[in-house]
């Protein structure tokens, strides 16, 4: 890449998903004159990619943050991931929760741990992430807490979850 402003840029549809329509922009020549939909541009980051699932209780207190390394991704969905306990990721999750005073329930965000820049958040979603089953199996219990909140029961989410748990996804065919 001939770096545009020293680092390449990442271009993707605002309403996109599953890695549809993404492009790496290394020079002005990589840009089209027009796009069929609104596009978002951000700095292209390097390094390992992580998703952090968090649970924020009714008073706005973060009750759990479970990061997982996205070891292998297919069509935007993690197919191999591993939980990773890191104090810096927990601090980022706490700061994010504090920066979103109205946020409640389950959120997820993604970051790259860029070797030059350090961890950089690039996406925040007010929903369960696609890799949430890994966080749940590791001890997050966030879905259970959504239900407990709705019926007024005490929460079970905590910071006590299994580090180093690996999840593998696979496809199977069914013939009728």
Predicted region positions:
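Glycine-/Pro-rich loop/turn segments that contact NAD(P) or position catalytic residues
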Residues: 1-5
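Short, glycine/acidic-enriched loop or turn micro-motifs at the edges of active sites
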Residues: 15, 46, 126
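Pocket-edge structural micro-motifs
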Residues: 13, 43, 66, 123, ...
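Conserved anion/nucleotide-ligand pocket segment
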Residues: 8-28
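Conserved protein kinase catalytic core
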Residues: 18, 49, 129
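ATP-dependent carboxylate activation and anion-phosphoryl transfer catalytic cores
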Residues: 87-176
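Phosphate-binding site of ATP-dependent enzymes
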Residues: 21-102, 108-120
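A general structural motif
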Residues: 6-8, 38
């Amino acid at each position: 890449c001939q770096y545009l402003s020293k680092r390449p840029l990442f271009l993707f549809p605002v309403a996109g998903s599953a890695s549809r329509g993404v492009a790496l922009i290394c020079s002005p020549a990589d840009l089209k004159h027009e796009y069929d939909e609104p596009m978002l541009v951000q700095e292209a980051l390097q390094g390992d990619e992580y998703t952090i699932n968090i649970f924020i209780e009714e008073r706005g207190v973060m009750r759990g943050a479970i990061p997982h390394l996205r070891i292998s991704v297919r069509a935007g969905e993690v197919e191999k991931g591993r939980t990773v306990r890191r104090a810096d990721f927990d601090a980022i999750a706490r700061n994010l929760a504090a920066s979103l005073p109205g946020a409640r329930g389950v959120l997820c965000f993604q970051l790259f741990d860029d070797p030059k820049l350090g961890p950089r958040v690039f996406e925040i979603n007010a929903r369960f992430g696609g890799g949430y089953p890994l966080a749940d199996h590791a001890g997050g219990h966030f879905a259970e807490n959504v239900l407990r909140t709705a019926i007024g029961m005490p929460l079970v989410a905590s910071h006590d979850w299994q580090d180093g748990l690996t999840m593998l996804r696979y496809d199977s065919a069914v013939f009728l």
